[in-house]
């Protein structure tokens, strides 16, 4: 391959790498911009996250040290009465599924669905396209740097008879009745479950 051809190929690859995060970034702006939460505190937080997205082109990537968008999912069973929770290895608590966005994720919704699928082992999940809640919390990521997760939370539904499979990102998976979540339930999870019930997506 000639030097010119190599240069063109390198330029094309660079453009692709730059385009994918910006598509993800724009989708986060679009999703949060269209969402109208009824809770004033959630709406105020939505505006704050949108302002952060406006100032940081890398806001959806884990390398963004001041904080970054994450995508999580409350995976419900077919009846909407139970939530699939993961026993998180680093936190040591039962949490909803989710995690960091990847540059290959075309949209924020796709990121949440990918995380839910990978961590549950369930194919054919369906996701509500509108966020259920937002939650911001401090965390030290795998990179070892203190940061914040600006977590956009969605509701996902499993098909009847769905079989779960524990991934290497979890110590365990368990279906919990929404009316009997763990005693030490994280505020973000409790808020998400409440929002899912208010929206009619959960029972």
Stretches found by the model and what they are:
Residues 12-48:
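Alpha-helical and coiled-coil interaction segments, frequently adjacent to or embedded
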Residues 121-162:
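Active-site segment of metal-dependent pyrophosphate-handling enzymes
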Residues 75, 155-157, 174-177:
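Short, well-ordered beta-strand micro-motif
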Residues 164-195:
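NUDIX/MutT-family hydrolases
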Residues 36-72:
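Acidic, metal-coordinating catalytic segment for phosphate/diphosphate chemistry
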Residues 1-8, 203:
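Intrinsic disorder/low-complexity segments enriched in small, polar and charged residues
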């Amino acid at each position: 391959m000639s030097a010119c051809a190599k240069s063109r190929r390198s330029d094309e690859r660079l453009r692709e790498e730059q385009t994918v995060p910006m598509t993800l970034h724009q989708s986060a702006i679009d999703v949060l911009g269209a969402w109208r939460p009824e809770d004033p505190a959630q709406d105020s937080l939505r505006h704050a996250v949108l302002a952060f997205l406006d100032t940081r082109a890398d806001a959806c990537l884990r390398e963004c040290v001041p904080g970054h968008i994450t995508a999580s999912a409350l995976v419900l069973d077919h009846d909407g009465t139970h939530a699939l929770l993961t026993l998180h290895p680093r936190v040591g608590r039962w949490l909803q599924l989710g995690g960091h966005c990847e540059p290959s994720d075309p949209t924020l919704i796709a990121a949440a669905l990918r995380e839910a699928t990978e961590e549950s082992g369930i194919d054919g999940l369906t996701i509500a396209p509108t966020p259920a809640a937002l939650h911001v919390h401090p965390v030290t990521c795998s990179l070892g740097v203190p940061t914040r997760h600006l977590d956009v939370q969605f509701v996902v539904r499993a098909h009847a008879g769905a079989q779960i499979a524990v991934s290497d990102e979890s110590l365990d998976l368990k279906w919990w009745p929404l009316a009997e979540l763990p005693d030490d339930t994280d505020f973000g999870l409790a808020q998400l479950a409440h929002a899912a019930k208010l929206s009619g997506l959960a029972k």
